[in-house]
Design a protein with these regions (language model features):
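Acidic/His- and Gly-rich active-site-bordering loop/insert found
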Residues: 1-113, 137-143
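Short, conserved micro-motifs enriched in small and acidic residues
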Residues: 108-123, 134, 215-218
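Structural motif
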Residues: 77-80, 108-109, 148, 175-178, ...
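Midchain, well-structured core segments that form catalytic/ion-binding scaffolds
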Residues: 163, 167-262
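Active-site metal-binding loops of divalent metal-dependent hydrolases
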Residues: 19, 85, 155, 182, ...
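Generic secondary-structure signature for well-ordered alpha-helical cores
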Residues: 16, 38, 42, 134-137, ...
Length: 262
């Protein structure tokens, strides 16, 4: 059985490490996880010790993916856990009783930045890896099916860590992949993709008393927003994933209330 107490302790350790994105990013937490796993691997006897692979992949300066692989005795597809190490920014709303990096436990609930997304899931995946390594050490042989843990960077931004892992051949379509993102305990078999885009409108400035002499870039953007919302509403829904959605997360424009924005 996986050691639940170990998973709890590890989750608290991970929450206490700032890996906000943007912010501290993943350098410290990646080194912490790597050191923990290296100490576990060091306790294996040969030939298992020689078989286990620990690999790093620098995706961005100072931001490394980490993969640990326990090879299997058969050629069956590996089981691959993939988890991201970064969190969103620490943000506001915390206090002295529950600080963002406090890892406070109350009523069997862990509080802190990233406790849910996804250091709790990351700790569970590492605990599964450690359990596998302990089984290998106790039984003196590798498992029938290979096992890999991938800890990725940049999930909260452009997911360049996951893309780099795929491009490097760390994971492919043949493997069985489990992502321990929070889903309220519901097993999900797919999720929506995403596309980020920027739109820039160019207008012609004029005084607000004579707007017909200019071209209002903000008004043009409003038309574009409404048009895109109507277009998305008309798209067919997916049987598993539901309808496509669009969100306009940020709009900037204008100079002063008395000037037609360009």
């Amino acid at each position: 059985m996986v050691d639940e107490d170990f998973a709890w302790r590890l989750a608290r350790e991970l929450v206490r490490i700032d890996s906000s994105d943007p912010g501290a990013f993943e350098d410290e937490i990646e080194r912490h996880i790597k050191g923990l796993i290296e100490s576990q691997v060091a306790g294996l006897g040969r030939p298992a010790l020689d078989a286990v692979r620990i690999e790093e992949l620098e995706v961005l300066p100072g931001r490394r993916n980490l993969m640990v692989t326990v090879p299997g005795l058969s050629d069956e597809p590996r089981l691959v856990y993939i988890c991201h190490m970064d969190t969103v920014t620490l943000g506001d709303g915390w206090d002295a009783d529950i600080p963002p990096l406090g890892a406070i436990v109350r009523n069997d609930k862990l509080y802190g930045r990233g406790a849910c997304d996804m250091k709790g899931g990351l700790a569970c995946a590492i605990a599964a890896l450690v359990h596998t390594l302990e089984r290998v050490a106790a039984e003196g042989e590798l498992p029938r099916r290979g096992f890999s843990l991938i800890c990725s960077v940049d999930e909260e931004d452009f997911m360049r860590g996951s893309e780099a892992a795929i491009d490097a051949g760390w994971v492919g379509s043949r493997e069985w992949v489990l992502d321990t993102e929070p889903t309220d305990g519901q097993i999900q078999v797919a999720h929506k993709g995403r596309t980020w885009f920027e739109i820039e409108m160019a207008g012609v400035t004029a005084h607000a008393s004579q707007p017909w002499k200019g071209a209002d870039a903000v008004a043009a953007m409003a038309e574009a927003v409404c048009s895109l919302r109507r277009a998305f509403a008309a798209l067919p829904a997916h049987d598993e994933l539901g309808p496509s959605t669009i969100t306009f997360g940020q709009i900037e424009g204008g100079y002063r209330p008395y000037v037609v924005p360009d």
